[in-house]
C-alpha cells in the first residue's frame, strides 16, 4: 500500500513524496510521539520533566533505563524524527571527516550496545568504551553520584565492561555508520609493569573496527593508571602503542589514528612534558580532559567527599586550562579534542577558541538532553 500526501501539503516528515507502508508508519508514530510527549528531546519542557523523574532513581539505574528507552524508540524507527536537526559543519581531523565537531565521550556506552540509537541523535562521532582485554565488574555500588546544583556527577565506575570479545561482537553488527572511536584501557588486576601489554591487546583487537582509537591513561578509578601519564612510564607506553599501531597498519593496510586521553589535574610542567612526549611518540591526537579528582568547585556538597572522578560544569575551567596549555605547546602539530564541562553552546565554542578541533559531551548531555548536541554544533559553526 502506498499513501500519497495531499498535493498542497508536505508529507508527515515535511517532504512531498510517496511513502511505503513502513515509512508511513514510522512518520505516523513520530507525529504521535511528538504530540503525546511534546517534542520530547528538544529539552525545553519535556526533557526536564523526564529527567526529573529519572533523577528520582539511583543514577546507575536511571542511566541504564534511559539507554534502554532510547533503544526502544530507535527500534520503532522514529527516534531520528523526534530529535532537532543538528547543523552540518564538516571538519577533517586526524585524517577523518566528521559531519559536525560534536561527539559523544566514552563512558556512556561502555560495551557498544547503544551505538545505533545514539547515532540517531546527530552526534558528529561516537566514542565507545572504555574496554579492557578481560571483562571486569568495576567497583562496588553505589559508584555514581549526582550533584545537580553543580550540573555535575562523581563516578568511580572502575572500567566496568564486558571485555573485548563482547564489544567486538557489538561493533561487528552495528548499523551506525558514522565515525566510531573505541576507548581502551588496562584491567585492574594487570600489574603496572604489564600495562602496555593490555593496551597492545586492545589495539590489535579493535584496530580494523575503529575509525580512531583512544588510549585512556587518565581515569582516577583504576589504581595506578594516572601514573602512566608521567615520566618514563608515559614515554614507554606511548612507544609501545605506536609500535602496535604500525604493526597493525602493516597487517591491515590501513592507518587508524590513535589519541591519548589525559587528566585535568596536572601543572604547567606536566602539560609541557605530555605535549613533548606526544609529539615525539608520533601519535595522532590528544583528548583533554578526563574527570578531575579536585573537589574545590563542589566543596560543601553532601557528595563532595565521595571517591572518584568529578565531571560536568566544574571541569569547564580546568579542562580549558589544559587545552590552552597544550595548544600553546603543540600549535597545529597535534589536534586536541576538548571535553569537560560543556553544558551549553558557549562552553562548546570556547573549547574551540582555546585550541580544540573537536569537542565531546557526556555529563552535560545527561543534564541537558539531546538538544545540547545541536546547540553546541550551532555555536561552533557560528565561530566561522
Q: Model-predicted segments: where are they?
A:
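Active-site glycine- and acidic-residue-rich loops that bind
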Residues: 187-200, 227, 233, 259-280
Amino acid at each position: 500500500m502506498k499513501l500519497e500526501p495531499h498535493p498542497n501539503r508536505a508529507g508527515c516528515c515535511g517532504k512531498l513524496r510517496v511513502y511505503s507502508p513502513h515509512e508511513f508508519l514510522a512518520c505516523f508514530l513520530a507525529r504521535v510521539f511528538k504530540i503525546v510527549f511534546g517534542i520530547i528531546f528538544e529539552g525545553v519542557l519535556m526533557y526536564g520533566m523526564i529527567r526529573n523523574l529519572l533523577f528520582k532513581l539511583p543514577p546507575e539505574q536511571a542511566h541504564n533505563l534511559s539507554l534502554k528507552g532510547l533503544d526502544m524508540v530507535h527500534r520503532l524507527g522514529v527516534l531520528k524524527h523526534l530529535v532537532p536537526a543538528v547543523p552540518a559543519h564538516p571538519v577533517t581531523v586526524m585524517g577523518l571527516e566528521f559531519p559536525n565537531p560534536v561527539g559523544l565521550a566514552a563512558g556512556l556506552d561502555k560495551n557498544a550496545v547503544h551505538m545505533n540509537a545514539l547515532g540517531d541523535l546527530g552526534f558528529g562521532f561516537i566514542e565507545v568504551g572504555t574496554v579492557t582485554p578481560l571483562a571486569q565488574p568495576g567497583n562496588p555500588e553505589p559508584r555514581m553520584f549526582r550533584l545537580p546544583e553543580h550540573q555535575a556527577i562523581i563516578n568511580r565506575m572502575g572500567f566496568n565492561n564486558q571485555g573485548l570479545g563482547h564489544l567486538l561482537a557489538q561493533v561487528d553488527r552495528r548499523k551506525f555508520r558514522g565515525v566510531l572511536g573505541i576507548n581502551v584501557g588496562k584491567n585492574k588486576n594487570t600489574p603496572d609493569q604489564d600495562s602496555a601489554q593490555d593496551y597492545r591487546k586492545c589495539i590489535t583487537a579493535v584496530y580494523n573496527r575503529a575509525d580512531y582509537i583512544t588510549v585512556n591513561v587518565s581515569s582516577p578509578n583504576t589504581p595506578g593508571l594516572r601514573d602512566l601519564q608521567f615520566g618514563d612510564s608515559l614515554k614507554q607506553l606511548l612507544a609501545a602503542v605506536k609500535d602496535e599501531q604500525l604493526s597493525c597498519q602493516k597487517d591491515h593496510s590501513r592507518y587508524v589514528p590513535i589519541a591519548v586521553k589525559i587528566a585535568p589535574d596536572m601543572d604547567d610542567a606536566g602539560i609541557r612534558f605530555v605535549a613533548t612526549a606526544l609529539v615525539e611518540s608520533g601519535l595522532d591526537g590528544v583528548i583533554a580532559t578526563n574527570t578531575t579528582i579536585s573537589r574545590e568547585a563542589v566543596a560543601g556538597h553532601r557528595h563532595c567527599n565521595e571517591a572518584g572522578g568529578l565531571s560536568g560544569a566544574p571541569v569547564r575551567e580546568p579542562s580549558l586550562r589544559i587545552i590552552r596549555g597544550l595548544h600553546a605547546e603543540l600549535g597545529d602539530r597535534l589536534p586536541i579534542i576538548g571535553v569537560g564541562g560543556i553544558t551549553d553552546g558557549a562552553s562548546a565554542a570556547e573549547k574551540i577558541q582555546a585550541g580544540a578541533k573537536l569537542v565531546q559531551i557526556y555529563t552535560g548531555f545527561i543534564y541537558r538532553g539531546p538538544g545540547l548536541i545541536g546547540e553546541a554544533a550551532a555555536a561552533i559553526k557560528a565561530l566561522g
